Amino acid sequence: MRGFSNEIILKRTLTLSDFTLRYHKRGITALQVIKAPSVSNVPVLLSGDNYGYFVMWDLVTKRPITHIEIEGNSHIIAFWWVETTNVLYILSKDSMLRIFELDSSTQLSIDLVRKLSQANKTDHLQWTKIYEMPINTLNFANFIIEAEVKPTKDNKSYRLVCCHTDDSETIDIYQIIEDSTFKLKRPFNNINFPRFLKQQNFLGISKDSKFGIIMRFAKLNDVIFLGYENGFVVGFKITFDEGLQRDIAELVHVSNDHYPNPILDMCVSGDELYSCSTDDFITKYKIPVNLQLETKYLRDDALLIKCPSSLRVSEPSKVHLPLKNIGHIDKVKDDYLVVSSWSGMTIVYNMRTSEVEQTFVKSKNNLVVSDSSMGDLTNGSGSNTESSSKSHNYKVGAMTCLESFDVQSDGLRLGQLRRIKALAKCNWCLIGYEDGTIKLNKI
């Protein structure tokens, strides 16, 4: 699929959206589908925009459940919901990570569908801000929250992996202890993987070369992945080092297939990691669930980093697409890869058949009258190329997917069950646009 044929394929597979969610007045910047049993017995959608509005949506009624307005109306970059404690982490462009707790005394019944009349009210759930801390957000990177391996019975403990406060090429790892006082520790400060790789002469990387800022984080099992501005992807896990008698970062993955282009997004599915950039392909890495135990390591105790002496650059498989400048990716079931480009196009790609099955766009419909004697209406561009579509398609600010799921019918009336099954039986692609709308599309 190359050249003009790409345009024919994309136009032929254009698909209308099934639903539109309207509440945001500014561009959507973050989307995530989560399970929140304390709020709903079906998945809910989280959305954020560039004016500091966070919204939790009921996907059955297509209405907001609750919202938060970030002080200063700061651009929301990413969020993370911790289901076990009803705590929400929101990272904003003002370089602050704010942590909110959902007041348990005002939560909805777990059987939300019996209270559909409440679904259009956004003030019946109360959020309490319990902490805030500075994080470097120069790069618009997201962050990772993971449960500690050994929580205690008296409190819950989590790791926060994020950009270092000052150096956007390095990371910090915090330990968050959620008890009556909410404690915060920083066992890892300024972990510098680029410096380590250059010291070890990995790939013959010049000591003067720059990895650039960290663009994205992803997590697969116990491995955290960092995508850099220069196209490198680094994966590590936290392991206990007998010699130092403390935890250190162990490198288990290095790849550079997008070099020198920046990593724009990453996602995981099963034991696979997917990454994208300004190229016209997606890379797919198969990550072993149980990594082999090693006996020989390269290490720098000052940096608190080690890697197996056998570590080599990972060889991926590539999925070539009729789009480039791919800003968002997600995986649905086993076969479908969903990608959004800077042009405003989102495609559903069947990896088994190597075909584009659906294309979603939201057009600005800027119609102009041609001076030609033939007299036609156009969208203001005489070109059918992907690059020209940037001017007449709304940009995609965020994209995520929801896979079909099973429904527990206990206690549901027939009408309620029908509405939930209509959502549950399908796979969905949810796209947030720069005009503040969120489109729901059946896959």
From Swiss-Prot:
Swiss-Prot/TrEMBL WD repeat ranges: 23-67, 71-110, 258-295, 318-359
Record field: compositional bias (Low complexity): 378-391
Disulfide bond annotation, renumbered to this chain: none
One BP annotation, GO: chromatin organization
Cellular localisation: Nucleus
Gene3D superfamilies listed in its UniProt record: YVTN repeat-like/Quinoprotein amine dehydrogenase
Family indicated by similarity: Belongs to the WD repeat ASA1 family.
GO cellular component: nucleus; TTT Hsp90 cochaperone complex
Function as written in the Swiss-Prot or TrEMBL entry: Component of the ASTRA complex involved in chromatin remodeling.
Stretches for region Disordered: 372-391
Keyword terms, alphabetized: Chromatin regulator, Nucleus, Repeat, WD repeat
Assembly and oligomerization: Component of the ASTRA chromatin-remodeling machinery complex composed of at least ASA1, RVB1, RVB2, TRA1, TEL2, TT1 and TTI2.
Protein name according to UniProt: ASTRA-associated protein 1
